[in-house]
C-alpha cells in the first residue's frame, strides 16, 4: 500500500502551538478507534498519537491548565486534555 502524504497543521492552544496531522484526524480508521476508546483504550491512544504526529506523551506534558500553569511531572489533567482534543477537532474539522 502506498503511503499518503499527510497534511500537518499547527494548532494553537492556550498560548502554545502543537503540530497536528489533519490527514490522520480525517481517517475513518482513526475516528473509529477514537469512538471505540471505551472498549479499546490502547487503540484510542494509538489514534491520538497519530493525530499528534507521534508526540502524544510530549503534548500531555506541555498542555497548560486554564490558568496558564504548566503541568507537573504527571502531565496535564484529563479536563485539560479533553479541552485540547476539542480544540484540535474544531481546528482541523472540515468547514462547511
Question: What would you call each of these model-derived segments?
Answer:
Residues 2-10, 14-16, 22-96:
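Short, surface-exposed, charged amphipathic helix/loop patches that serve as local interaction elements
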Amino acid at each position: 500500500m502506498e503511503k499518503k502524504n499527510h497534511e500537518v497543521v499547527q494548532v494553537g492552544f492556550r498560548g502554545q502551538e502543537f503540530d497536528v496531522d489533519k490527514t490522520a484526524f480525517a481517517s475513518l480508521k482513526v475516528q473509529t478507534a477514537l469512538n471505540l476508546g471505551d472498549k479499546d483504550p490502547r487503540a484510542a491512544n494509538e489514534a491520538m498519537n497519530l493525530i499528534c504526529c507521534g508526540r502524544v506523551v510530549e503534548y500531555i506534558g506541555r498542555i497548560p491548565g486554564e490558568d496558564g500553569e504548566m503541568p507537573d511531572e504527571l502531565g496535564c489533567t484529563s479536563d485539560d486534555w479533553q479541552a485540547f482534543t476539542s480544540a484540535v477537532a474544531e481546528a482541523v474539522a472540515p468547514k462547511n
